[in-house]
Swiss-Prot record:
Residues 90-103 have a biased composition (Basic residues). The Tat system comprises two distinct complexes: a TatABC complex, containing multiple copies of TatA, TatB and TatC subunits, and a separate TatA complex, containing only TatA subunits. Substrates initially bind to the TatABC complex, which probably triggers association of the separate TatA complex to form the active translocon. This is Sec-independent protein translocase protein TatA. It comes from Bartonella henselae (strain ATCC 49882 / DSM 28221 / CCUG 30454 / Houston 1). Its main location: membrane. Part of the twin-arginine translocation (Tat) system that transports large folded proteins containing a characteristic twin-arginine motif in their signal peptide across membranes. TatA could form the protein-conducting channel of the Tat system. GO terms for molecular function: protein transmembrane transporter activity.
Length: 103
C-alpha cells in the first residue's frame, strides 16, 4: 500500500482514464504523442546534419583560403619588380598624377 506506482495502481488509473475520455480520445492522444516524438527526433537529426555541414564547410574553407594568399603574394612581388624596371624617371610619374587630378 505504500507504493503508489505499483502495477495494480497503474492499471486502475489507466482504466479510469479510458472510462473518462473514451478509447478514441486516448488512442488519438497517444498518436499525437508519437507524432511529436517522431518530429523531435527528425529535427534533432536535421540539426546534427546542418552542424556537420557547417563544420565541413569551415574546415574546407580554411584549407582553400591558404593557397590563394600564397599565389597573391607571388603576383604582387612580380608586379612590383616590373614597375620598378619599367619606370625610367620620376617626372613621368608626377605628370600622370597631375593629369588625373585635373580631370
Amino acid at each position: 500500500m505504500g507504493n503508489i506506482f505499483s502495477p495494480t495502481h497503474l492499471i486502475v488509473i489507466l482504466l479510469i482514464i479510458i472510462v473518462l475520455f473514451g478509447r478514441g480520445k486516448v488512442s488519438e492522444l497517444m498518436g499525437d504523442v508519437a507524432k511529436g516524438i517522431k518530429a523531435f527526433k527528425k529535427n534533432m537529426k536535421d540539426e546534427e546534419d546542418i552542424l556537420e555541414d557547417k563544420l565541413e564547410r569551415a574546415h574546407h574553407s580554411e584549407t582553400v583560403d591558404v593557397e590563394p594568399q600564397k599565389f597573391q603574394s607571388l603576383s604582387v612581388k612580380r608586379a612590383t619588380t616590373r614597375v620598378k624596371g619599367s619606370s625610367s624617371s620620376r617626372k613621368g610619374k608626377t605628370s600622370v598624377v597631375k593629369k588625373q587630378r585635373v580631370k
